[in-house]
A protein has these predicted regions:
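The conserved cystathionine-beta-synthase
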Residues: 1-6, 13-14, 29-32, 56-65
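Terminal peptide-recognition signature
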Residues: 2, 10-12, 17, 28, ...
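Catalytic beta/alpha-barrel core
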Residues: 9-11, 50-52, 70-81, 99-104, ...
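Active-site-adjacent beta->alpha loops and helix N-cap segments on the catalytic face
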Residues: 18-38, 56-60, 76-100, 105-116, ...
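Short beta-strand/loop segments at the ligand-binding rim of alpha/beta enzyme cores
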Residues: 40-50, 91-106, 121, 154-165
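Active-site beta->alpha loop and helix N-cap motifs at the rims of alpha/beta catalytic domains
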Residues: 46-58, 62-72
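Alpha/beta catalytic cores of nucleotide-metabolism and tRNA/nucleoside-modifying enzymes
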Residues: 50, 117, 139-163, 168-169
């Protein structure tokens, strides 16, 4: 109807005729093309920001959370360490409403370790991607499908799992 009648915006009003929003043709198109986009309760795309495991990680994540990110990703080449879990616990202690995703890992033991520490999501992948140098530099890596299967079986869908690299569609 919008396109046929060359109407750019469709007002959304309450019973009292108070304007509460506008719908555009591109809004409808986005809904049709990307029905499972990760959005917040207001319909906005959720935003995550990655931090490393450094001396200023807590300060950086605090600034990111104050700016409105929905999730923090603790991004490290080897997520199965006490230092990573220490940072995870520190962030969870002060930011209960913010999802904390942690990775990368490649084993069921590491997944359980992060899950027990409070991770809201887990990134899987040690050396699987085409631009990743971990296998060359460190001499270690796990085939991506094997790592994902191992991790998913061990945590039984308790948190989302992200496959980070090594998969072609």
């Amino acid at each position: 109807i919008l396109q046929q009648n060359k109407i750019e915006k469709l007002p959304v009003v309450t019973n009292e005729n108070k304007l509460v929003g506008l719908i555009t043709f591109s809004d409808i198109t986005k809904l049709k093309l990307k029905p499972i986009a990760n959005k917040d309760k207001y319909g906005r795309l959720r935003v995550a920001a990655a931090i490393g495991v450094t001396d200023d990680s807590v300060e950086r994540s605090t600034a990111l959370i104050k700016s409105g990110v929905d999730a923090i990703v603790i991004d490290t080449a080897h997520g199965h360490t006490e230092r990573v879990v220490g940072l995870l616990k520190e962030l969870k202690k002060n930011n209960e409403d913010v999802d904390i995703v942690v990775g990368n890992i490649a084993t069921s033991e590491a997944a359980k370790f992060l899950l027990e520490a409070g991770a809201d999501g887990i990134k899987v992948g040690i050396g699987p991607g085409s631009i990743c140098t971990t296998r060359i530099v460190a001499g270690v890596g796990v085939p991506q499908f094997s790592a994902i299967l191992d991790v998913c079986k061990s945590i039984n869908n308790k948190v989302p799992v992200i496959a980070d690299g090594g998969i072609k569609y």
